């Protein structure tokens, strides 16, 4: 999360964003346009480009579905692999993600790039120890899930709030146009204070992570309930 790395990420994001927005314009012309699924696809495309150094291509829909099933499994009441159940779909999604990342580890170690996936594959400590394949797979699944899912929810919340407050929508548009450039560098982000205000207020009103499951370290009675 140092500035040189963040600057590099921003530059790698912009062609993906431009491609996504072009797709949106074609899709939205005269049609109903649902923001959430399109944002989810875009943020996953960005995350894989930045953290993996490669586009998902034809695997995009399959990987996106696997992520969704894993997230939904976290709220499953019946945690047993009943066919067709939420937990079973989550386990199947997890297996899909594990196979996807595991199949790419050897190539990343042979020809590493500057992406985070490559760095995890070749990272060594002072004694020359590396992450195991399982370590790399678990890191990548968590990273991409956290990166694209929370970003999607946050951006969707922002768009929802801007739809309710068109005056702020105009203010953000004017602020962005005032930069006078089609692509941004890292220092430009400091020139968008109103954008930051809307982002933070959206996070305050609608948290992207609103449930955190916990369990007690030992049985306890609370408010008449045995936990």
Give the location of each predicted region.
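Conserved cytochrome P450 K-helix E-x-x-R motif and the immediately C-terminal K′/meander segment
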Residues: 99, 103, 182-223
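Secondary-structure capping and boundary motifs in well-ordered enzyme cores
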Residues: 35-40, 70, 89, 93, ...
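Short, surface-exposed loop/turn segments at secondary-structure junctions
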Residues: 26-35, 57-58, 182-189
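Cytochrome P450 catalytic-core helices
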Residues: 43, 148-175
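Cytochrome P450 catalytic core segment centered on helix I
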Residues: 44, 55, 65-129, 133, ...
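Generic, well-ordered alpha-helical scaffold segments in large soluble proteins
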Residues: 20, 50, 73, 99-108, ...
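Transmembrane helix-loop-helix
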Residues: 9-28
């Amino acid at each position: 999360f140092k500035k040189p790395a963040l600057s590099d990420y921003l530059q790698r994001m912009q062609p993906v964003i431009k491609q996504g927005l072009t797709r949106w314009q074609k899709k939205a012309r005269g049609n109903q346009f649902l923001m959430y699924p399109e944002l989810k696809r875009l943020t996953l495309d960005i995350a894989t480009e930045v953290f993996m150094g490669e586009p998902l291509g034809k695997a995009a829909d399959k990987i996106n579905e696997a992520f969704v099933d894993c997230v939904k499994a976290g709220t499953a009441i019946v945690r047993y692999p009943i066919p067709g159940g939420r937990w079973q779909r989550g386990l199947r999604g997890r297996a899909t993600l594990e196979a996807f990342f595991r199949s790419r580890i050897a190539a990343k170690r042979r020809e590493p790039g500057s992406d985070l996936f490559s760095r995890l594959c070749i990272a060594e400590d002072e004694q020359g120890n590396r992450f195991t394949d399982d370590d790399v797979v678990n890191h990548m699944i968590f990273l991409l899930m956290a990166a694209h899912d929370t970003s999607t929810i946050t951006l969707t919340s922002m768009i929802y709030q801007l739809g309710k407050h068109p005056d702020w929508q105009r203010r953000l548009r004017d602020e962005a146009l005032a930069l006078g450039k089609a692509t941004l560098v890292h220092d430009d982000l400091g020139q968008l204070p109103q954008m930051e205000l809307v982002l933070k207020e959206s996070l305050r009103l609608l948290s992207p992570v609103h449930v955190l499951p916990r369990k007690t370290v030992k049985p306890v009675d609370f408010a008449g309930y045995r936990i």
